[in-house]
């Protein structure tokens, strides 16, 4: 008897006739757990049951890099009734490249690949990373909003759909932007260090209030809209710059005024908050020339990607006082960030935690699975970044 870790659902009518409960059973074999099966956490080997291959139809299969437990046990159980999810749980890229061919040979092929959170040890997601899954791989989904570590052009050229998460981490990231804004305004980095050192309010002067200040949002996608909605509570005046202007109704909803150029936003904003994806167009978007346009003693908030901002130019502006404070959740060369940001009292620092909440993670993983389900059912995911039905090699997503 050959063991298998593939799971199939016994039809209800067959289970009823046999007097058995309706459970998920392995194909033509006895029940077993597998280190590569997401279901191994949820099913126990209660009895040995033999099934004929003719009684069940094969289901489409997805491979997940590490266990997608954040999606929730009940959700995964429900998803697994219709589709097969296998897991390859390895610590780094080297092990992935070593183990993937064996996994595909044993349990493949796989037409979908699920990439969860915490991707640093595995990046980049390119031809080498996916090679052993070809030619069957047709979809890659990521639980992250940003996708600069994914070679989307290569995927498009190879007729592979790519999906990031559209809205899962948006509100959590917006919360981080608001937190950094308030922390910068209230100079909490200095305040906390002083309090921990036992210097209670020593040398402190009144901080800045948000009321009446102008907040300029660069990138009015899902994150930018959440920022605008939340910022209005603090009586901030909202302006925004976007590749495409919002509908008038949306501008009314978010109480946001459109700036037709980036320069017009920078010149008039007291606080500049960045929420754009990282791509060729946005890399270095805020450099020395853009910072020169900003109001004196302004505040810069970045929850997008580190490379959107020229860090050397930012440091120079902080030291000169051109920029009064910065609130940063993202950096170049993470986690080895510039030592200046670790020590400067002029910077509020967070270790890229914007989307790291339990609710955001659950939503992100489920959004991945919904894209997989849509692809398995219809041949197209719900929210692709690229379009493999159009000209190859050109991702369709740019600025929001």
From Swiss-Prot:
One of its GO terms (biological process) is terpenoid biosynthetic process. The active site is at residues 305, 334, 352. One of its GO terms (molecular function) is glyoxylate reductase (NADPH) activity. SUPFAM superfamilies: Formate/glycerate dehydrogenase catalytic domain-like (SSF52283), NAD(P)-binding Rossmann-fold domains (SSF51735). The keyword NAD applies. It is an enzyme of class 1 (oxidoreductase). Its EC number is 1.-.-.-. It holds the Pfam family 2-Hacid_dh_C. Keywords: NAD, Oxidoreductase. One of its GO terms (cellular component) is cytosol. NAD(+) binds at residues 222-223, 303-305, 329, 352-355. Pathway: Secondary metabolite biosynthesis; terpenoid biosynthesis. The keyword Transit peptide does not apply. Belongs to the D-isomer specific 2-hydroxyacid dehydrogenase family. Dehydrogenase; part of the gene cluster that mediates the biosynthesis of enfumafungin, a glycosylated fernene-type triterpenoid with potent antifungal activity, mediated by its interaction with beta-1,3-glucan synthase and the fungal cell wall. The pathway begins with the terpene cyclase-glycosyl transferase fusion protein that most likely uses 2,3-oxidosqualene as substrate and catalyzes glycosylation immediately after cyclization. This is Dehydrogenase efuE. It comes from Hormonema carpetanum. The lineage of its organism: Eukaryota, Fungi, Dikarya, Ascomycota, Pezizomycotina.
